[in-house]
């Protein structure tokens, strides 16, 4: 459901930030690597099972927020990004370094900004919201 501009942006980004909540309802944000397969985001990594985002998901806190952003330009100021609210689940899959666990994030709602066609004024366009099925 992402546009071609959004997909190209996702492919070019090496990092995302994931927000989860712990048992005390304390939000926490961590930088993570990610992959997007067209339907779900995968978060993996070395010793994933020891990370806060993994432990929070194991504890049943499956609602997450994922942010992928950058600055296209400082002058003029041109921030761009994609924010996803979704559901995380732990999956076991074959990764780059062999079998292991990962967090699979299924988007429920996403917003993007700064992905406008050249010549389009961002202030008039506003964030693009997608409700995922």
PLM regions and their residue ranges:
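Short, basic/aromatic recognition patches
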Residues: 1-17
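Short beta-strand segments
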Residues: 13-48, 66
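A short local loop/turn or secondary-structure capping micro-motif enriched for an aromatic residue
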Residues: 37-38, 50-54, 121
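Short solvent-exposed loop/turn micro-motifs enriched in small/polar/acidic residues
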Residues: 11-13, 26-27, 81, 96-98
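Short, structured beta-strand-loop surface elements
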Residues: 47-109
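A generic local structural motif
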Residues: 2-5, 29-30, 50-53
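Flexible glycine-rich active-site/ligand-binding loops centered on an Asp-His dyad
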Residues: 102-133
